[in-house]
Amino acid sequence: MEHLAPEQTTARPPAAAYRNLAVATVGFALTFWAWALIAPLGSDFGDRLNLSSFNQSFLVAVPVIVGSLGRVPVGALTDRYGAKVMFPLISALTIIPVLLAIPARNSFVAMLGVGFLLGLGGTTFAIGIPLVNSWFPPAHRGFALGIFGMGMGGVALSGYLTPRMAKHGENLPFIVVAIALAAYALLALVLITDRPDRPIPTSPLATRLGQAGRLRVTWELSGLYAIGFGGIVAFGVYLPTYLKTWYELDPTDAGTKAAGFAVVTVIFRPIGGWLSDRIHPATVTACALAVVALFAILQAFDPKLNPMGTVNFLLMAAGLGTASGSVFALVSQVTPQPQVGSVTGIVGAIGGLGGFVPPLVMGAIYSAKDSYSIGFMLLSDLALAGCVYAYGRMRNIGAQRP
């Protein structure tokens, strides 16, 4: 086994580290629920607004691209102002589009605008990573980042709870999420604390982003994260539509199964971080992506949902979750502390963009071919390429500091 560089310390994190980790994870989950509010209702919006497969895919994908790109400036702003400012601020601002969805739901154009603004909820990832990274020493960092990554469970919350709440009133999911975000913003304002000795960059935002962008490892990690986390996001926003269209499930059943997929990714993300504290994270990433490649190609042959299709999706979820955790363990290992927020923003943005494209591709492929097989073949090819690159290149830079 390949072990990590000896720089890692076994010093026990302070109690404040665990408090910040817990509060940040809750915030990540709630804002991700808001970010993913449209996806579980995508088929309902498609029927209500008479949308084509492509337009329905575009509607659920808009928050993904905005949230992804927004991580770049939000990550850099977190480097400068800290999570104590940014977490309450972003949580409070996300309430606005959540409530705007209520009057906008009968217009495709208005819902596109709401989706654009909901993207704000997807940026908190770039706030939490530098916060957790600063509080935990290297020997505990991979697992801690994996625990924070469990906030992706907000997608599962959305998939499971949103359609069920909507049965009791179309406005109910949006009202509940808005109240939860308001309560969390107040909680974060009181409980989140930035590490007193954290380095605060003084250079302009554009300069810091430029410095992060010039690091080769930024783009290498971005590519790997686009496959791992991008796959999670893509399935999170499109799996309900796929299950409804191909396997003819009703929206509630489709949302429940999509939530199960998301739960598995959430469980395996800290496992990926934990393994990366013990084995080189590039090796963990390569193995996880190999699993994704194998079961994506099996799903391309359109097996019955029970049991083979379900097994394929759950094992892909395990691989994607593990890869997401291990890639960010590698980010924290090779990135200088003052640049973690900026690099995280870029890597998170590219990862999120990796989740924007597949729903559009899947919708376009289905419209043209009445089949999703080509889409799963493409996923298998990308995962295999990431596996080879992670094992062949990224293992050699684990102990470097740019």
Language-model region placement:
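Cytoplasmic helix-loop-helix junction between adjacent transmembrane helices
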Residues: 114-151
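Glycine-rich segments within core transmembrane alpha-helices of 12-TM secondary carriers
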Residues: 141-162, 348-358
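C-terminal transmembrane helical hairpin of 12-TM major facilitator-type secondary transporters
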Residues: 279-327
